[in-house]
Amino acid sequence: MEVIRSERAGFCMGVALALKKLDMLVEKGGHVGTFGPIIHNPFVLEEYAMKGVRCFGSVQAVKEALEPFYVFLETIDEEKRKEGQLQLNLLIRAHGIPYSTESFLRNLPHVQLMDATCPRVKEAQNAISKATQCGQGTRTLLLFGDANHPEVDGLVSYAKGKYIISPEPEKLIEYAKKNPGEEMVLAAQTTQDRAVFDTIKKALFEAAATQPIIWAT
């Protein structure tokens, strides 16, 4: 049997950038961790775990990891502090994290936070934040995606008002039909099918009494 490897096989741009940033932190030394799995690949995660990289699944886990830093704060001299021995170098996963979580982590003492969110995901987060703000009011976000996916957790956290998530186009279209006077923003999880997204976009234009604001990821 002949096995042909696609020329495009390998990590996507966002994942490749995230791993590059993580490699830089590992080479630098010190305490290194990621908030959430850096990517969804158990073999890669195991490789980094063997290098001493910790994967934190919650803010509480990060706070618990910092406790030894606080306990020995008074016994660590200034030189060691400058060398980063009293610092956790924490990398945000490629899928991104919720806005409130990122803000909290940035304000934690002894945490140096580095953002490894995929540039396309970060662009989507910022666009959702901007598009869902309407003067003093807000617009409803219709998100085409999987509610259980970590990227989606981050995306909807940037919505200024309410949001509807569904991987089923019909449900998003149905919501628009039932709320014709409501201003809406359409966005998608970055891994969703563009052709299906365009179908939803077209249907929303036809269904809404007032044209919804459309934004595509």
How would you describe each model-predicted region?
Residues 1-217:
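The feature marks the mature, well-folded catalytic cores of soluble enzymes
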